[in-house]
């Protein structure tokens, strides 16, 4: 089910959702097309029924050398909300985020007003310039620790007790835009290969099993003809007849680079997906 469809001026990418008191907060990359260049922002929209959404509100600054984007998810810690996100610097002529791309968190008390981004030092106590290019963060509250997943050498992951001090743990081959949920003592890693939304499973982050790749009836979606990608799965049992919702975006770059629309699907078993809530 479509949420926001791309226009000449804007496209919508990289969804991440959080549910609080019956309200869905949908964070995403908003791409603005101007005659001079594209600008990337993190924006938010809200809904209580998956159908009616508020107008997007931009949360980050307009700066082509930062291009805050790709919100990963929100977690709550010590009564504060933390949203992880990336920078995606594109100097004149660069198509993709350059080697200065890094990952950050923003903190909030109310999910609406956010402090300035703070660098996620997921490689430990090394300088920012030595961290290497990294994008697409995702934070998992794993009970006695936090795990930060990010796109570098496939998917890399680091652990922390306090969201401030991190230890790098390793990496494995994987697509981008990782989202991780834990089911029955098993971690399910949703990720994006060249097309589709892939699911990998692991119990120990050492051995990984390929589960399936979802295409969500792409052939019937002209707005997603180039790619189905960036799946974000969340438990919606508190507000929906279905146990899960998966927000995602579909690429159609006929008009311009990074052209995309946001949509959502619903499931009880993570295998069969429905278009209507």
Language model feature labels by segment:
Residues 1-277:
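Carbohydrate-active catalytic/glycan-binding domains of CAZyme proteins
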């Amino acid at each position: 089910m479509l949420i926001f469809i791309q226009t000449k001026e804007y496209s919508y990418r990289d969804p991440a959702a959080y549910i609080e008191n019956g309200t869905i907060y949908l964070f995403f990359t908003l791409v603005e097309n101007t005659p001079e260049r594209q600008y990337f922002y993190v924006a938010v929209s809200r809904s209580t029924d998956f159908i009616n959404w508020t107008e997007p509100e931009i949360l980050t600054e307009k700066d082509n050398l930062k291009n805050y984007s790709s919100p990963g998810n929100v977690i709550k810690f010590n009564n504060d909300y933390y949203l992880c996100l990336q920078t995606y610097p594109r100097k004149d002529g660069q198509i993709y985020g350059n080697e200065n791309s890094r990952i950050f968190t923003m903190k909030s008390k109310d999910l609406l007003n956010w402090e300035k981004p703070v660098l996620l030092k997921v490689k430990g106590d090394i300088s920012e310039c030595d961290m290497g290019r990294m994008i697409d963060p995702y934070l998992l509250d794993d009970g006695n620790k936090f795990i930060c997943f990010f796109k570098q050498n496939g998917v890399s992951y680091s652990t922390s007790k306090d969201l401030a001090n991190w230890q790098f743990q390793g990496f494995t081959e994987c697509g981008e835009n990782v989202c991780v949920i834990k089911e029955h003592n098993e971690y399910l890693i949703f990720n994006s290969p060249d097309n589709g939304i892939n699911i990998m499973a692991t119990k120990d982050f050492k051995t990984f099993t390929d589960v399936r790749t979802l295409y969500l009836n792409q052939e019937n979606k002209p707005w997603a003809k180039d790619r189905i990608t960036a799946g974000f799965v969340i438990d919606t049992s508190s507000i929906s007849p279905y146990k899960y919702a998966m927000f995602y975006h579909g690429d159609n770059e006929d008009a311009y680079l990074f052209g995309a629309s946001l949509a959502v699907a619903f499931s009880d078993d993570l295998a069969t997906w429905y278009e209507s809530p």
